[in-house]
Amino acid sequence: LSHPDRGNSGVFAVGAYEVQISDTFGLDPEPRAWREQALLKKPNTWGGSVYGLRAADVNMCLPPLSWQSFDLKFTAARFDGEQKISNARITVWQNGVLIHEDFELPLGTGGGPSGPRAEVARGPITFQNHHNPVQFRNIWLVER
């Protein structure tokens, strides 16, 4: 069993940093437990994770077919010309619970052989369609 078989998507800030949206309801993030459950993916790729960089502080995924909510507070990396002078930062709430607090993003997230995505100061907010049906609603963007 791998969690993408139960749903897999994500939201990308500036096209470079992914917060994973996937069905990991009821999975235990303790390493001993996920090995026993025959999971193929580690918790830093589970729902609510900053993909490949950091697992959520708590698995806040609701049961399948429940609407999930995410609130993201994101500050892009800063650059002086081509030189990065400060890392991006993100705070994430899932279903009303803080799961990442002011996490510093040392590099873009990425999966597969291409590795981390390039970091940029500005870019789109994108949503991933990754093999499973997914729906989004009530999307808000507030510039700060």
Report the location of each language-model feature.
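Carbohydrate-interacting regions of secretory-pathway proteins
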Residues: L1-R144
